[in-house]
Amino acid sequence: YFYNYLKKNKKILFNKTNIIPNILFVSAKSLSKKRSLKIPKKLWLKNCLLATRLKEVDIIIELIGGSEGIAKKLVFEALKNKKHVITANKALIAKYGDQLAKIAEKNKVNLEFEAAVCGGIPIIRSIKEGLIANNINKIYGILNGTSNYILSSMDKDKLEYKDSLLKAKSLG
């Protein structure tokens, strides 16, 4: 889906950023799985970790999920190899966010995880850019769209936790 979005919106992205996104590789846990995406075979990379070592790759976009396994290896390797990383991986950021941020800072690359926080509301960018003069080290609280949805529906709709959780899961 992300691939199709980038392909479809190249001109819009260029007009906003003056950058033409060029997808060099695509990888997945299972390359044999049938997909509705129309991705050319030549773009499929069997071992996604190879992309972290290639000079022509500037940004790694991780959408695998989970805090361990290949997702963890991919993000750590990418940052260590001076690649910018974009991820929506809540579990990885929750468990290793501090470590990843230190590696990114050390290697002068960006670690972008806005989509993993607060249901995609641009809170991270607002804090980093809008509150730059303030000395904010950590933020504690529920900054997660699913949790916010559950708590809101429990309050507004008077649902029990279990029912609210099931409703949230059914909505994705």
Positions of predicted regions on the chain:
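General beta-strand structural signal in soluble alpha/beta enzymes
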Residues: W44-K46, I61-E62, I86-A88, L111-A115, ...
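Rossmann-fold NAD(P)-binding glycine/threonine-rich loop
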Residues: G66-N81, A88-E129
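Glycine-enriched alpha-helix->loop->beta-strand junction motifs that scaffold or abut catalytic
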Residues: N81-H84, G145
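N-terminal glycine-/serine-/threonine-rich beta1-alpha1-beta2 phosphate-ribose binding loop
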Residues: Y1-N81
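Short, glycine/acidic-enriched loop or turn micro-motifs at the edges of active sites
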Residues: I61, G65, L92, N148
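Core active-site phosphate/anionic-ligand binding loop and the adjoining beta-turn-alpha structural block
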Residues: G97-D98, N110-G172
